[in-house]
């Protein structure tokens, strides 16, 4: 299949959680986004901005409250004519096969009583209906793909380090050649040197099989080196979408600039004034009027508090939601 | 003068694994020392030993830890109680978890103060409020009357820093104070810790795995791996002229933003 083909498309997707006393929490608000073959799309933002909820909706772990998710132009989850539809049964199984997820903490992914080998054999037995013997061969092959020896087959998760476990999680996720890989903070629990190895591994297999990646992270530098498209979220809304390369130069939204300003880099001048974003984010419960960022933005004017800005394109592949851009 | 001095310190856990092997360095007055390294390198063990709070089974096998001129190992419990809080204070990674969830911030804050210095509750309350304001917490009255769960992670971390700083200790030990925080909040916390050093002359030992934070804050950087001190030197020396291979590797694997090296 050719590159750049659209695989997953989100249209005006929202997610609200009901709280006590008739309050609601808007975790994701009106997000439209598409994932293309062979492209790595990164979502960055602070905790509570809805990036994990978004990933859980794409994998259909969480029902969508409003809007629609399309997989190869087929609606797979969302609201249609006032009814909530979602894939079920055999179709959902098939979808799960093509959309795989890697989680943040590998230690919580594995069952402590299951050997690594059993864990790697599962996809082959469940989806490909292989015999145990064949599945065992495939599991060895999976281990080889992530540069681990065959001796890992008979080990238990507690005998392995976090980096090794994450490799095995990747091995299982890419075993059946999925079309989309969703990485929810896949490297943030790991040390930097291991992080680099894991990223190299993901990149290598992407070149090989051309899967799309939805990469969720809060590490801006990592995202820039790895992804072709960057989506910046704040309080459930997308504030900026831009190309991955050199986004320090191109970033236009005040929040993106603030995020970039708070990254400490090794070779910075230590006497440089630290840019501090004042205040706290607004509460996500209840209705937010106007721009989500207006209470912390230095350029905020009256219009920001009245009207919510919409995403508007300013260059190819670059969209910003701000009244003053 | 050195506030803290480690002389050939080795620490052994019960399973006879040496967590820290023959580490020596000193923290001069009013300076910031960053200890960097990956998980399992013994950096947290080292800093916990410095305040005498090793986890169960941990033991100082050899060497001396000197606070000022005094050896920590020979101090009585009462002496230690005075050193902790007034002499040195510590901030943990999840400072929020160390606050009592069933008591308001002001109650525990004032109690902490009154444990170490004779004062009335009212005086304590005033000091606490002033300190929280120094740390730029919005609406100090609200923070004082809140329970820990009502505050965000960054706010709890700042409350913990305020508590640690309000006794004006000579030395502040910080064990990964920002790694659970978002980048923008991390920037706030780093800035305030540096401001405190400038205003009060507190020496800080910060344990971190974030090279960026270490490079921003520190005057001296100590690099640790597998319990050994690989390199210790001034910031310039370690960042720009690393000698040890491990330090070099650590510096290259950190992802960098484009346009970073040429100063934007």
Q: What label would you give each PLM region?
A:
Chain B
Residues 166-170:
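A short, proline-enriched helix->beta-strand linker immediately N-terminal to the Walker B motif
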Residues 36-38:
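The feature captures the beta-strand-to-loop junction immediately N-terminal to the Walker
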Residues 214-216:
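A short, surface-exposed alpha-helical micro-motif characterized by mixed small hydrophobic
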Residues 187-200:
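Helical segment within the ABC ATPase nucleotide-binding domain
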Residues 59-71:
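Conserved ABC transporter NBD signature motif
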Residues 229-233:
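ABC ATPase "signature
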